[in-house]
Amino acid sequence: GMLPGYIAETYTKTQTQIDLLNLCKFSNSRLIVDNVIGIDPTEKQVILKDRMPIKFDTLSINTGGEPNLDNIKGAKEFSIPIKPISKLVKVIDDIKRKILQSNEISISVIGGGAGGIELVLALNEYLKTIKSIKKIKINLISRGKYLAQAKNKFSQNCILSFLKDNKINVILKDEVVEIGPNFIKTLKGRIINSEFNFLVTPISPPKW
């Protein structure tokens, strides 16, 4: 939940991360750093790559979700998925370095839910601080009729008005079908120039 704050430079990277070692010490838990390669429900064991299996009575799986990159042509090569967060933080740092060397920037956020709205506003706040950029173009693209469809109509109108006041180009009722190195193509035939394309669409459980 602190990722938008990190992008907007409200928080440092350290503040956005949880120190697992200290957390485990505090909770009298054991921290094991390894890859899980299987689960044996019959024997009630978690199979690890480099260690002996771990027995369990109850197993909680908290690996997070992944975006489906197969539905959009070029998404695997040219999009920036919002999940997993650990990878995104590294990508954000690279993007910020590129932005500091630019005088024009075009960014698109694909997904009109709360996560997409948070992200687009955080990016906008960050870009306002970069004095070297002369031209900023930010797009928010959603296939829905409204932004933040889980919210009530009043909230949706307030969000849309705030985005427009901040000169963010909002595209509704259209769907991204292709992402290229410097462009986005939509189902309705729009070709949008966009250098950095963030994917904040619904996530699925990991394929494993």
Question: Over which residues does each language-model region extend?
Answer:
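A Rossmann-like FAD-binding core segment of flavoenzymes
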Residues: 31, 38, 127-208
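Conserved Rossmann-like nucleotide-cofactor binding loop
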Residues: 66, 115, 146
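Rossmann-like dinucleotide/flavin-binding elements
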Residues: 84-139, 190-191, 202-208
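FAD-binding core/adjacent interface of flavoenzyme oxidoreductases
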Residues: 26-108, 198
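Beta1-alpha1 glycine-rich phosphate/pyrophosphate-binding loop at the start
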Residues: 1-30, 108, 118-150
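Short acidic/His/Gly/Ser-rich catalytic and metal-binding motifs that mark active-site loops
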Residues: 1, 68-71, 207-208
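Structural alpha-helical scaffold elements that stabilize or flank donor/cofactor-binding regions
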Residues: 23, 52, 190-191
